[in-house]
Structure formats: C-alpha cells, structure tokens
Amino acid sequence: MVTVGYVAITRAGISTFPTGIIKIRISLKKKFANLQKKPSEQRLSAPALMKRWRCCRWGMWCIAIRLMTVRFPAITLTASLKMTSITWHLFLNIDHQKVIQSLFLTVTHP
C-alpha cells in the first residue's frame, strides 16, 4: 500500500446539509501535491474526545477517514467518492447533530 496523499480538513472546509450529508471537496492539485510528510508526522491541534477510523473502498483506492468529534456516542458513517481529474467529492453520511471538529483523510493505493 502506498500513501498517495492525506489532508486534515477543519470545520471551515466542511459543508453540511439538513439531511446529515457532509460534502467535502478536496483539490488534489492544491492539497496533495504539497504534502510530503507521512501522516504520523503531522499532528492535528484540535482536541477530541473520540477518534475513530472508518474505511471505504472505491475501486482500487482505500479511503481511511478519522473523524474527531466532541460527542462520545458512536458514529454511523458511510462514504462515497466521486473523482475528477483534480477534485474529489467525498460525501459523508453522518448524524448532523454530532459536532465535527476536524477530519483526517488518508488516501492509499495498493
């Protein structure tokens, strides 16, 4: 598995909808091209009471998602990914009452 890119997204970069769908647009050209460090070398400053990983396979890609919330109850998360040449549209179906502080995304390819 090769880590292609990763990005930490703050709440400012997250758009929420009344249905509980969270849409995140990630520009691969801007975000992923400048990331040279391994995910372990970059630490998120946002405090979190819960850190959980959720994985989603999309074709040959594996999307690992770690949500940081301020609420402790378990999160039910489903993800779908649509990809263009420079932008990924990641849709997270999550309980919109949960407060998301930050999101950590890792993209790996076999």
UniProtKB/Swiss-Prot annotation:
Domain of life, source organism: Bacteria
Protein name: Protein ORFj in retron Ec67
Keywords assigned by UniProt, alphabetized: Transposable element
